Structures are given as C-alpha cells and as structure tokens.
Amino acid sequence: MAKGKRTFQPNNRRRARVHGFRLRMRTRAGRAIVSGRRRKGRRALSA
C-alpha cells in the first residue's frame, strides 16, 4: 500500500514569502506580532 509524501517540503523562498519579516510589516496585525516578539526579547522576530 502506497503512503503519501511527507507534508513538510522545505523551501526557503516560500518560507520567507509566507512568514517573512516584509510580510509581517505589511499589515497592522503583522507589525503587532513583530513588536510583541521584540518586547518578549525573541532572538528571531520572523522567518
């Protein structure tokens, strides 16, 4: 019986486009996410 493929197929360009910093800065909610992560002291603010 054939199994399906793994669902996570890493791709850096897609990762940046979907979760990246520029995308976060585009919307008010995204900026809120980044500022919250800054406040918390996260090492990485976004992908």
Curated annotation (Swiss-Prot):
<dbReference type="GO" id="GO:1990904">
    <property type="term" value="C:ribonucleoprotein complex"/>
</dbReference>
<dbReference type="Pfam" id="PF00468">
    <property type="entry name" value="Ribosomal_L34"/>
</dbReference>
<dbReference type="GO" id="GO:0005840">
    <property type="term" value="C:ribosome"/>
</dbReference>
<keyword id="KW-0687">Ribonucleoprotein</keyword>
<comment type="similarity">
    <text>Belongs to the bacterial ribosomal protein bL34 family.</text>
</comment>
<dbReference type="GO" id="GO:0006412">
    <property type="term" value="P:translation"/>
</dbReference>
<protein>
    <recommendedName>
        <fullName>Large ribosomal subunit protein bL34</fullName>
    </recommendedName>
</protein>
<keyword id="KW-0689">Ribosomal protein</keyword>
<dbReference type="GO" id="GO:0003735">
    <property type="term" value="F:structural constituent of ribosome"/>
</dbReference>
<dbReference type="InterPro" id="IPR020939">
    <property type="entry name" value="Ribosomal_bL34_CS"/>
</dbReference>
<dbReference type="InterPro" id="IPR000271">
    <property type="entry name" value="Ribosomal_bL34"/>
</dbReference>
